């Protein structure tokens, strides 16, 4: 069993990220870009991470496997975001260039989970600059059991529940 924490769009403000790391004690931390911090910090605090459109370090795409599940990680700025529904489809097309069961991305600052063309999409939203309807910071957790992703949950950050 692998416990996973997914965050994105922290924009150089890392306090909540570290709080969540300590609170959830995950086996794996995934950051979907716009971290705006140093490589040293990223390497110490994220297992897998990519560069966003505001980052000067990191790869555009990371391909990895947890258990028997194939992941594609990208920020999301690799496709135009004029219309969210169309944007999701374009990101799936990009992810399908690789073995992909799960696509993790950020960029919109809006949390989202859905399955498109047999690919599980996960956008954790933003821990610092949310653009969801309630302007509430968000992140995601899930568990990998061999070939199964379970307990996929979008969480809304509340300092009182993590400190």
Curated annotation (Swiss-Prot):
It holds the Pfam family Metallophos_2. This is Probable metallophosphoesterase MG207. GO terms for molecular function: hydrolase activity; metal ion binding. Mn(2+) 2 binds at residues 34, 53, 75, 107. The lineage of its organism: Bacteria, Bacillati, Mycoplasmatota, Mycoplasmoidales, Mycoplasmoidaceae. Its cofactor is Mn(2+). Its EC number is 3.1.4.-. Binds 2 manganese ions per subunit. Transmembrane segments: none annotated. Keywords: Hydrolase, Manganese, Metal-binding. Mn(2+) 1 binds at residues 9, 11, 34, 109. It is an enzyme of class 3 (hydrolase). Gene3D superfamilies: 3.60.21.10. Belongs to the metallophosphoesterase superfamily. YfcE family. InterPro entries: Calcineurin-like_PHP_lpxH, Metallo-depent_PP-like, PdiEstase_YfcE_CS, Phosphodiesterase_MJ0936/Vps29. It comes from Mycoplasma genitalium (strain ATCC 33530 / DSM 19775 / NCTC 10195 / G37) (Mycoplasmoides genitalium).
């Amino acid at each position: 069993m692998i416990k996973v924490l997914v965050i994105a769009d922290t924009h150089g403000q890392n306090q909540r990220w570290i709080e969540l790391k300590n609170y959830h004690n995950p086996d794996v931390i995934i950051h979907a870009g716009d971290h705006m911090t140093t490589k040293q910090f990223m390497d110490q605090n994220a297992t897998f991470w990519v560069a966003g459109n505001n980052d000067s370090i990191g790869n555009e795409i990371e391909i990895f496997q947890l258990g028997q599940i194939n992941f594609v990680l990208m920020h999301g700025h690799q496709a135009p975001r004029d219309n969210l529904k169309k944007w999701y489809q374009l990101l799936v097309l990009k992810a399908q260039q690789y073995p992909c069961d799960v696509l993790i991305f950020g960029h919109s600052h809006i949390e989202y989970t859905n399955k498109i063309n047999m690919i599980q999409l996960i956008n954790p939203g933003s821990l610092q600059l949310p653009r969801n309807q309630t302007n509430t910071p968000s992140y995601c957790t899930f568990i990998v059991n061999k070939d199964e992703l379970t307990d996929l949950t979008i969480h809304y950050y509340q300092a009182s529940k993590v400190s």
